[in-house]
Amino acid sequence: CCGPTACIAGCKPCC
């Protein structure tokens, strides 16, 4: 779940 919209998707650990 990482990518340009990771934070928006709620994948905080991926930020």
From Swiss-Prot:
Please list the residues that carry the modification 4-hydroxyproline: 4, 13
| A single GO molecular function term of this UniProt record | toxin activity
The protein's location, in the record's own words, is: Secreted
- Location of Cysteine amide modifications: 15
What intrachain disulfides are recorded?
Answer: 1-15, 2-11, 7-14
Q: What is its main location?
A: secreted
Keyword set, alphabetical order: Amidation, Disulfide bond, Hydroxylation, Secreted, Toxin
Q: As annotated in Swiss-Prot or TrEMBL, what is the tissue specificity of this protein?
A: Expressed by the venom duct.
Q: Which GO terms describe its cellular component?
A: extracellular region
**How does the record comment on the protein's domains?**
The cysteine framework is III (CC-C-C-CC).
- Family classification: Belongs to the conotoxin M superfamily.
Q: What is this protein called?
A: Conotoxin tx3i
